[in-house]
A protein has these predicted regions:
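A charge-rich, low-complexity, intrinsically flexible signal that marks solvent-exposed coils, linkers
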Residues: 1-167
C-alpha cells in the first residue's frame, strides 16, 4: 500500500494538470526510497521502476499500457489498471510472499550510480523526434513566463557553447 504522502503528492500533480507519468513518478520515487531504507531489495533498477508503476496503476493513476512492451508486461499493466477499480483487498498471504522474496534481494540497484546508469541508458534509447515532441509539449504547458525564462536559458546555453567551441 502506498504511503499517504505519496498519494497526496500524486493527487496534487493531477490537480495541477500534470501528466500521468509525472503522477506515477511519485510512486517510483517512494519505491526507490523503500529500497534505500532497507525495507526490501530489488533485483534490478528496472524492477524498482516496474513496482512503482504497478503501484501507481493500482492507486488509480491513468497510465496507458506500454505499446512496445512484452505481452506479459502489457497484461500485467492491464491487470493493475483493472485492480484499481475492482475494490478487492489484496490477499495478505500473497503480499507477505512478495515482500519476503524482495527482502532476499539487494539494495544496490537503488544506489545513485545505478539510477544514473539506468537514466542515461533509457535516455539514449529515445529518438530525436520523441525528444522534440516532449519539448513542444513542455513549451505548450509552461505558460508565458516559463516559456520566456526557458528561451533566455536556451540563448545563454547557446552562447556558452559557441564560446567554448572557439577556444
Amino acid at each position: 500500500m502506498p504511503e499517504r504522502k505519496t498519494l497526496q503528492r500524486a493527487a496534487r500533480d493531477k490537480k495541477q494538470g500534470k501528466s500521468a507519468s509525472t503522477q506515477a513518478g511519485e510512486f517510483v520515487r517512494e519505491e526507490i526510497e523503500h529500497v534505500r531504507e532497507g525495507k526490501h531489495g530489488v533485483r534490478s533498477t528496472k524492477q524498482a521502476v516496474a513496482i512503482g508503476l504497478s503501484k501507481a496503476r493500482r492507486a488509480g493513476v491513468d497510465l496507458p499500457t506500454p505499446k512496445k512492451a512484452s505481452a506479459s508486461t502489457r497484461r500485467k499493466a492491464r491487470q493493475d489498471s483493472e485492480a484499481a477499480h475492482d475494490g478487492h483487498a489484496k490477499s495478505p498471504t500473497r503480499a507477505r510472499a512478495t515482500t519476503r522474496a524482495l527482502k532476499r534481494e539487494s539494495a544496490r540497484p537503488a544506489s545513485k550510480s545505478a539510477l544514473s546508469r539506468h537514466a542515461s541508458k533509457s535516455a539514449s534509447r529515445r529518438t530525436a523526434a520523441d525528444r522534440s515532441a516532449a519539448a513542444k509539449k513542455a513549451a505548450a504547458t509552461k505558460g508565458a513566463a516559463g516559456r520566456s525564462a526557458a528561451a533566455k536559458k536556451a540563448a545563454r546555453t547557446r552562447a556558452a557553447n559557441r564560446a567554448a567551441a572557439h577556444h
